[in-house]
Amino acid sequence: MYPIIMEWNGGGSFNGRPLSWSKLERILSGKKVESLRPVLHEPDAQAPSSAMQGEASVPFAELHATSSYNFLTGASDPSDVVVQAKKLGLVALSVMDRDGFYGAVRFAEAAAEAGMHTVYGAELSLQEGVLTVLCKNPEGYKKLSHLISDAKMATGEKGEVRYPPLPMVAEHAAGDWVVLAGFQWLDKIDYVIDCFKPENIVLEFGSTMTPEDADRNEYLRRTQAKFQLRGILSTNPESAARGSVRLAGAKQALARKMPLADAESELHPMGTTWMRSGDTLLKAHPDYADLIATTVELAAECAFTLDLVAPNLPKWDTPGEHTEMSWLAHLVSTRIDTRYVGRSADIKARAATQIDYELGVIEKLGFPGYFLVVNDLVEFCRDSNILCQGRGSAANSAVCFVLGITNAEPISAGLLFERFLSPDRDGPPDIDIDIESGRREEVIQYVYEKYGRDNAAQVANVITYRTKGAMRDAARALGYPQGAADAWAKGTSEPPDDVLELAAQFKGQPRHLGIHSGGMVICDRPIADVVPVEWARMDNRSVVQWDKDDCATAGLVKFDLLGLGMLEAIHHMLDLVAEHRGKKINLWELDLAEPEVYDMLCKADAVGVFQVESRAQLSTLPRLKPRTFFDLVVEVALIRPGPIQGGSVHPYLRRRAGEEAITYDHPVLEKSLGKTLGIPLFQEQLMQVAVDAAGFSGGEADSLRRAMGSKRSPERMAALRSRFFQGLKDTNGIVGETAEKLWNKIVAFAAYGFPESHSQSFASLVYFSAWFKYHYPAEFCVGLLRAQPMGFYSPQSLISDARRHGVSILPITVNDSGVEADAPNGAIRLGLNLVKGLGHDAAQRIEDNAPFDSIPDLSRRADLNVAQVEALARAGAVDCLGVGRRQALWQAGVAATEKPGMLPGLSVIEAPALPGMSAFELMATNISATGVTADYQPMALIRERMEELGIVPADRLLEVEDGTRLRIAGIVTHRQRPQTASGLTFLGMEDETGLMNVMVSVGLWQRQRVLARNAKALIIRGIVQNAQGVATVVADRLEPLDMGEFLSRGSRDFR
């Protein structure tokens, strides 16, 4: 058999020359080319060179591949598809999604790295059928993006799509698309031709390795001859290689909501097709050489790179003759005196110089509009009485501080502006704005209203499979019962091998499109010029089809509007103190050095305090003993994965306690590391070391920081190393072993340093929340309750902590409680929103119509149904009406027939004499109905029994000698297994006297996994570790606590 080589065919005559790769490159450049056709060659004919990796003797372009970003269809990441295509010697590739460009940027990046020519397109879910189109050029891409976006937004529902009829789709394309018409379109081919014209239609022949191929392709051949249409061959691969075909099949079965076994009649018999080379296809289909050749020809017509011109930010409407830059400078100049009032003359002078420098950098980089947009968002919050503050690297900027975007003053803190915005930066800055979570939606809707729905959208978040989800969906796809799938996902039983194998393939795969926590893009023209927009699950939210990284790659400018529960809680605290105490508190006028606040934190009395309430932080506070605001900055940064993994925590604490000498590898490091006792903690310190020791500019230092990020280029690192060593020598005469030591320390430190600017911003909230906890514990607790869900602790734990601080807890009653908790006279009145099954609207009607004199009166005037009256009865909320809970439940059914407009008293019924409830029954009912108890912490009811068992209460643990074996008991509040803990699990436990820390080894967890994972309350036997005001029990045995299931609704578990 003679080899088949693709050759030029000039006007239908054979010219005797094989197609060279340079010619092929010319084809793919987008120039008009002659057709390709296969011809036979003698064995001694010159074949194309095989020196190039993956080069094939038969050029072929796969123009209808898909990836895992075609959700619940494809099995391979776009990069894997590109790598496999390169390996097989393909000359061009199209990786497309259904109704979107979800994976387009990742495909473009991978193809650019591999040197693969790209063709862009999509599958469109038209009413007439699924239409596959390729874009001929960037204009075609833009049109396709707009069509998809319009179809997605037309429905008003996430996941839905509604395209116009085919003729209108064709009119929209205006000749800038190629339609790939497969077998499913043959009965409508006349209609398709009439709409799109023959020159824009290519028949798609299938090579799916199924018996249907031959018959279907025969029909396609007849149609091709009849209408003189071009045709191509495609394997339509949903998997890059054969190894992941079962995963693709499983995904498609899930999409059909049926197990693989039942879906087999609708799926490919092998799961799916996979990518193959031109050589393989020609061997399998020797009669389709012309179709293979046409793939290259069509790729030449349609190949282009995704170098889209991203929209700019909208031009700012500046007053008078001002430019954006002059208006920004004007705003800064009018606010600088106010923001720096009370600061020293030296700080003011340095700030003025720094601001001039920053404004110069902003002007040079062309970013004044960015700052004006952020300033406008902050001003909207301020005018709307919404608490907000910028955080992250923006806190390094004096301009941001003066504008009121951030509240950390960078000059006195010694923060480096270049960490935020370097003169060498090639993209816009990144300003995160924390907004009180309960009102963030107002800010988001303001953005939509101001800039228009077409020009503003939220950034997507691609939801990927994690361990539990992968296990569940693998089990579902394989047809196992839901109960078994849940048990395997929870780890309560071992899954079979087939589930484990498939779950491993699912893990990390994209599952569906979600929404970013707060990222929004704002443009001066429709976002759909670049990427389609669709509805999000949340009401009135629209989202682009790309995540934050894809948006950044494409040049879309993102603003992060992040919801922060503590800001909402603090706003409630401010309002409560103003309402009940008559005091208006200005957070920025608080004394940040109040000793009593720091005394409280030193005792680890920080339940509910922002950022320092976790188990690890509570263990660190007594050892760090914070006395200044900067100590809080360190505390925020210290207990992070980076410093923990980098080994900074214990050396710093030892030096802090005077147990270890403060030393430096070279005296020049004292300036940058002195404030953290010679232990590097912050990313800015890495930059400052480079400036002080090696003479780097601020911009160079930021380049060093970024180069040492997660994707380290060996070439770039080598160049920076050379520059660093030369700088050490020239600036400070540092050479040899000391230079090597400094470089190695910087390289290691870069992987774990935490931004000081971030810590500075958060430390303010640490202090504010601690200040409220010390001065106004009732308002503090109620603020946290009103902002739920948030933080580390459940409402029950927060209420118990307030009780331990002497605050009276008043129960829920229909006559005294509002919808939310309140803080009258320094006490806490629990709110109706805690009553399970009541609902917000019913709670609001109760608040609006109170007081009531009977259950029928309550039911009639608050318009309650039976279930709502029963919920109130179980919660004890009608005890104030002089009716016991059992009597109230008896009356509920009849009383609920009382409705507004009816004559009162018609439903009165006398309940029989019923026994009252015991204290334990009342407690258990309260926990079940509301999740909290007002009178006491549940463990108090069984304290006598605990003492008989020799159980040590939480408040006596610090009195126990280190190394003593003991038993403790309590409600499990948390389970946490940090990645930095080598598999150890930490339990948070609580009794009526306080909190306890328990450490469970890997072996003990495995031996008693069901109990450890599921018990609501436990007895723990173990060894107490007692040092520096911190007690931890290292468990060696877990026991169930009798009736423990009644003591709590469950724990809050974290990683």
From Swiss-Prot:
Known CDD domains for this protein? DnaE_OBF, PHP_PolIIIA
SUPFAM superfamilies per UniProt: PHP domain-like
Name the reaction it catalyses: DNA(n) + a 2'-deoxyribonucleoside 5'-triphosphate = DNA(n+1) + diphosphate
Keyword set, alphabetical order: Cytoplasm, DNA damage, DNA repair, DNA replication, DNA-directed DNA polymerase, Nucleotidyltransferase, Transferase
Cell location: Cytoplasm
What EC numbers are recorded for this enzyme? Answer: 2.7.7.7
- First and last residue of the signal peptide: none
The biological processes this protein is annotated with in GO are: DNA repair; DNA replication; SOS response
**One Pfam assignment:** PHP
Q: Which GO terms describe its cellular component?
A: cytoplasm
The broad enzyme category this protein falls into is transferase
What are the recorded GO MF terms, alphabetically? 3'-5' exonuclease activity; DNA-directed DNA polymerase activity; nucleic acid binding
* NCBIfam families, per database record: PRK05672.1 (NF004225)
Q: Which family does it belong to?
A: Belongs to the DNA polymerase type-C family. DnaE2 subfamily.
Described function: DNA polymerase involved in damage-induced mutagenesis and translesion synthesis (TLS). It is not the major replicative DNA polymerase.
* Protein name according to UniProt: Error-prone DNA polymerase
Native source organism of the sequence: Corynebacterium glutamicum (strain ATCC 13032 / DSM 20300 / JCM 1318 / BCRC 11384 / CCUG 27702 / LMG 3730 / NBRC 12168 / NCIMB 10025 / NRRL B-2784 / 534)
Give the lineage.
Bacteria, Bacillati, Actinomycetota, Actinomycetes, Mycobacteriales
